[in-house]
C-alpha cells in the first residue's frame, strides 16, 4: 500500500512539474526561415589555397607569441558566449547584473535562442575543421568546442550582443564593439578558430541583427530593456 501511495504521489508531482516547465520554456523571436543565414555568408577559404594557408600561419604565429595575460584572457572569454552581462560589465560597471536587469535578461534569453538556431546550421553548412583538427601543430588552450569552425560562434555572439546593447546605450557603442573584437580575437589566441572564422561570425551577426530588429515583439522588449538599463546606469 505504501509503495502504491508513493507512486501515486510521484505521478501527481509530474503532472504539476511538467506543465510548469513547458510554460517557462524560452523561445526566440524569429521563425525557422528567418534564422537561416548560412548562404548570406562568404564561404571560408578552401583547403590547399593560399588564403587557407595564410589563415593557418596566422594561428601558428599567434600561438608562438601569446603571452600569459593573453592566455588567461582567452580562457576567461571562453565563458562569455550567451552571457551579455559579464560581457558588458567592465563597460557598464559592476551593477550591470541579471538581478538588477530582469527585462534585459529576458530579452537576451530569447535572442540567444535565435542566435543558437542560426549558428549551428551555418557551421554544419560549411563544415570547416577547427585549426587543431587540420594541423597538429596547433595546440588549443581549451577543450574542443561544439560544432565546426566557420563561422565563429563566440564572434557572432559578441558582435550581436554589442549591436543590441548599443541600441540601448549608443554612448558606449565604440567600447562595446572593441569588447566584441577583443573577445573574438581570444578564439584565435586559444587556437580554436582561424581569423577568417571571426570575420564570418561578425558577418553572421550583422545578417541576423536586422531581422531581429525588424521583429515587433523584440522592438517592444528592447524599448523596455533600454529604459531599464539607462535608468540603472543613471543615463
Q: How should each PLM-predicted stretch be described?
A:
Residues 1-9:
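Bacterial N-terminal signal peptides that target proteins for export
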Residues 8-19:
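Bacterial N-terminal signal peptides
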